[in-house]
Amino acid sequence: MSLSPHVENASIPKGSTPIPKNRNVSSIGKGEFLGSSSSNNSSFRMNHYSNSGQPSVLDSIRRPNLTPTFSYSNGVYMPESHRTSSFNDSYLPYDKNPYAKTTGSMSNKSNMKIKTKKNAINTNTRKSSGLIYTTKVDKELSSIDKVNDPNINGLVCAGKTHLGLYKFSPSDRSIKCVHDFITPNSNTSTRGTTSLLPKLSKRTRQNKFSTIADVKTGFNNYKNCIAVCNNSTAISIYDLNKSSSIDNPLITSLCEHTRSINSFDFNMVESNLIISGGQDSCVKIWDLRSNKSKSSNRSDISINTASDSIRDVKWMPGYNFASKNDQGSSTYGNLKSGYKFASIHDSGYLLKFDLRQPAQYEKKLNAHTGPGLCLNWHPNQEYIATGGRDGKCCLWFVGDNANAAENTVLNYGNSPSLHAPNTSLNNSGSLAFPKLTINTGYPVTKLKFKPAYSSNIYNSLLGISSMGDEAEVRIYSLARKYIPKHVLLSETPSLGLVWWDENLIFNIDKGTRINGWDINKEPTVLENLSKNTTTWRDLDGNGLLSVDQEIGSYEVVEPELQPTSSTTCKKHPGTIKNPKNGNPENQGIIGGIKKGFSHTGLTSFTPERPPTLKAGPTFSTKSLTLASGASSFNSSSASLTSLTPQTENREEIAIEPPCIITLDIPQIFNNIRLTKIAHSRKKNVISESSSMKNSPVEKFKYLARQLKFSYIREHNVSDSADTAYKNDIENIDVVKNATETHGDNTTTTNNNDDGDDDDDDDDDDKIIESHLLKKYNFPENNTWATLMNEKVNNKKSKRNSSSSREFDEKDVRSSISSISASRQSHDRARKIDKNVEAELQEKIQTLVDLISIATHNASVYLSIDDLTNFKIWILIRDSLLWDLKWMTSSQISSDNASNMDANESSDFEAGENLKTGKEFPEEDGAGTSGAESLVEERPQAFRANSDEPSDAEKKPVSKLKEQLKNTEIIPYAQPNEDSDEVLTKLKELQNQRLESRTKMGETVSDDVIIEEDEHEHQEEEQPHDSPTKSAQFHASPIAKSIPILQKREHRKSFIDTFMLHSPNGYNGDTDIGNEDDNISPRFTYNSVSPRSKVSSLQSYATTTSQLETFKKLSSHTAPIIGSPRHAPSRPDSIGREQLSSSLTKKLAKCKKIIADPPWDTKKLIKQLYNQATETGNVVLTVNILFLFQTIYQITEIDIAKDAIAHFLLLLHRYELFGIAADVLKYCPFEDIMGSEGDQSSIRLFCERCGELITNESSKEKLRAEAQQTGNKKIMDKFGYWYCDSCKKKNTSCVLCERPLKKLTMVILPCGHEGHFQCIQEWFLDENEQECPGGCPGVAFI
């Protein structure tokens, strides 16, 4: 097909169509369904062939590549075939196509050849045949409207320098510019190049309209009037009939607005009225009959809406729709159309007014979240469609509540559908929520209802034009809001549209082109959609989208209209009826209101509107002084009756449109995963463990979910208990101190009355002390209980001896001072004891928690057959059990030590009790009750002696309970291979030492030796670990409290024999020689476990004589082993020195074993940690660091933090976010994630000026004032609820009207904000449902 360049003012005959630039012709498919709006440059190609160098017109106005934006929320994807089908060449005749010429002509026109893919055409796609009119002008266009004269097929288009009257011809389908009111005498050309006075036209200044150039035409008697924005604050009225160059077409100018005018509109019923709104937030109403001068600076009615700038204002239309029935033709209209108007504002508010009471708006709706841009009334129902910058088109019911049910569909269809409008709201909800919302995805600047009668609001059509790059006009059916009915494409983005009638619609675009479509000949979007399409839902590929096979329709089945025979249908007044005696030149809107609008034929508004008004917008008083008889009406005037058909509120059955079913791929995969997990749980343990072994990732996830990493959450309860315990102790100390002070005063005064008061105080103290003894279960032999009993006995003796007061005053004072001194010493000791008890109790609770965690982790590893890690945790658990056993035994020994005398008890408690804790009231072995509940899975480790199995049935498990109950039994250690040799060498050395001592005549005192060796022994024992040293010192009270050694001969272990070298113990009266004679190499063998070495150490430290013997022995051997200062070296002692060096090594080895046992928990855990790091066991490494780093300092703190941080990254990688959050929450360290773990900063901006709120100036000012006055409360005034830049406060609470100083606030659907406490009190406590600010609708359900 050969195409010629575009010709100006040419019509489009049948058979050809222009092809828009950058549009491809293809079929519907997967790519088109996903993003069909984007052009593919490879789908077609244009080649220009020209015989001359003159450029083509099409090339000069070539449209740039545009990438339209889409709203994925409405689910509409236009196929490219439908988009390009608007310019189909199958409708217009070819012989009248101005673009096509004969192929043989050699004119200076360029030809174009179009290459398309043969396989790209879908035979099922219906081509467009609706584009009838199109033309291009050389003037910039911004607005379009139709001429409301049925005899003239006219359009009015306006721009900055253009106001033209265009006529279209249905016969030849052409559009021509009849007259340009800016360029005179341009009735034959839209370019305006011809003029009767060319010289004058060159010197004449062209009139330019404002950038917001709106154009409207009048109705009825004023149908020849055209209103445009001549400048930003004036409205110019032109006469269409004055098209010659001699006549001046300007009728008048209306200029009262102080800022730019955004919109104006003619009244369809009262055609002499024109309304305007602008940036000054004022609505002006003008009466053209009273403004016949060339310029009018005063409107008839001015309404200040008390809101922000007005974007659009419209009168309620007054269409007359005729229909036929049994009685003939009837006309349907709306009797309120002469009085009602609405405006939409930058704030998004929609206001509805009544001209008869303009002081108060009828309705105020929060229509949009951003600025509202346009509105349009429904032709015959009280609905308004609004468009905003938020990309939404909303339908609002603005009628009276009593008639709301007439226009509300109760149930739209039998089942909910994604395409069905939401009409289940009640009448009150319709005031606050839109009846329908269409998400367009781009700002809506123009929208118009199809001028056709519709009894069901959802069968109405709505044309929408956008502000963005969408080169199309979409026509939606309200019955199907997700898929438009028609999409009318243009070359460039659309600027405006207008309905000529029910079928014909015109629009203008940025390419200065005027287009007209017949929508009856346009295919619907459903007809061009692919019937079998499945594609990705979005660009990320997170879902599939498919279309159902049932296409559906765009209409709702309407019920049949059955008007009653008694209803009289009268025609709505379509023309202005002037009274006989009325002079139209002298009649304005004020006179019309005073005379009851008798000349207009409108009914009285007195029965409808209440006389009382609320405080609202202000208005001019020019037209509001009404006489008492102002509501009288002319009896001959036509009475208007609502002829809108009344139907019953029956349920309507909707034809459900295609339902979009989205398949969420992540959700499907998640369901598959859950199904697999549920199926895997049914398998046996062997298959599960094998799968864990085969998949390291699954094993890691399982261990991360099942293992316990921290005991902090369980430790919080014990902390609170310890805190309460300490508070109780402090309170009792305060009471006791007060009581003692009072008691001392009463003793000094020696008055009988004071003595009685002292007795009462003593009774109160006794009650308090007895209560505390019962509360904390202190035994009778407890130190604190002993002191309390001693105090009671002293007071009893004091009361008994009070009758005989014949002693000396000096003796009394001395006795009082001694008692007070003893009490002070006891109080100090008691305070130290309680602090130590609290610390030890906390350590015991920590050990109990760690033991339970170790048991749990061992069971987790056992469930997956990981025996290596199972044994590791069992080893850790047993080591912790030994520590727990030692702590509980030290507590029991402290109870027995309390029976010492006063001085020894004080010294002992001050020195040694720093290592003891809170006494247990139970008998021996009862301290393991906490451990019993933690190892229920292995009860054989805690069986009593009676339940102990045989030797064949014994397993190598821990016997904590048995050992705690039988602490008096002293086990013995097994001899080793070096014991015989060591004892033999030791005996030889001692004999040589005695011989040399006899020869040299040395006389060394035993006391001196003991003192020297005690000093050396302390220096050697100092670097040893504290657990072993504490065990040696805390074992001696047990031997004193349990006299088992006196009943039978002491059975010696290897350490007893070797270290003490005396089978019968040491006697203080015997000398060293006697000890040497009692040396025996025999040993007693016992079948106890190697762990009994701890008890051997305890038995070694049970008696003081044994310790002294060992000290003397070491002092005797010191000169020979390695101390040359005690004895001079001799030539014959070289062999003995060599012998003593080997002996010294073996003795040091034995002492090291005693001081650092192999079951030391710190040493053991460090070795396990090193092994885990070397083998790469990440879970075990992190688990050890979490549990034991703060207790045993396994490694450096930086290394521990780095390891935990990497572990958190692993958890995030495998999507274990919940576990990572718990690990980070209970981690004992801070700043694990470094800079990544810092909290996000919140930046607040002023809602008035938009600046960042820092308030540094006010902060410095308040700080300086606080420093000068010394009042720190002044800084409480500082905050971020105000702005230093604009010196204004932020939004106040809607209820208490105080500033919102904190971040916690509540935002209601209407936009109001408030404190959380205020909103909670308003809605929950007072059971309110509306906004506290009085906004209509339900704000809280």
Curated annotation (Swiss-Prot):
Region feature Disordered, mapped onto this chain: 1-39, 559-593, 600-619, 630-651, 736-765, 789-830, 941-962, 1013-1043
Bias (Acidic residues): 753-765
UniProt zinc finger (RING-type) residues: 1293-1335
PROSITE patterns: WD_REPEATS_1 (PS00678), WD_REPEATS_2 (PS50082), WD_REPEATS_REGION (PS50294), ZF_RING_2 (PS50089)
Phosphoserine: residues carrying this PTM: S1036, S1080, S1087, S1089, S1123, S1133
GO cellular component: cytosol; fungal-type vacuole; GATOR2 complex; Seh1-associated complex; vacuolar membrane
GO BP: positive regulation of macroautophagy; positive regulation of TORC1 signaling; protein transport; regulation of TORC1 signaling
Sorted UniProt keywords: Membrane, Metal-binding, Phosphoprotein, Protein transport, Repeat, Transport, Vacuole, WD repeat, Zinc, Zinc-finger
Record localization: Vacuole membrane
Gene knockout outcome: Leads to short telomeres.
Bias type Low complexity, positions: 630-644, 814-823
MF GO annotations: zinc ion binding
Biased composition (Basic and acidic residues): 951-962, 1015-1027
InterPro entries: WD40/YVTN_repeat-like_dom_sf, WD40_repeat_CS, WD40_repeat_dom_sf, WD40_rpt, WDR24, WDR59_RTC1-like_RING_Znf, Znf_RING, Znf_RING/FYVE/PHD
Additional information: Present with 606 molecules/cell in log phase SD medium.
Entry similarity comment: Belongs to the WD repeat RTC1 family.
Self-association and partners: Component of the SEA complex composed of at least IML1/SEA1, RTC1/SEA2, MTC5/SEA3, NPR2, NPR3, SEA4, SEC13 and SEH1. Interacts with ribosomes.
Record function comment: Component of the SEA complex which coats the vacuolar membrane and is involved in intracellular trafficking, autophagy, response to nitrogen starvation, and amino acid biogenesis. May be involved in a process influencing telomere capping.
The protein, known as: Restriction of telomere capping protein 1
Annotated organism of origin: Saccharomyces cerevisiae (strain ATCC 204508 / S288c)
Taxonomy of the source species: Eukaryota, Fungi, Dikarya, Ascomycota, Saccharomycotina
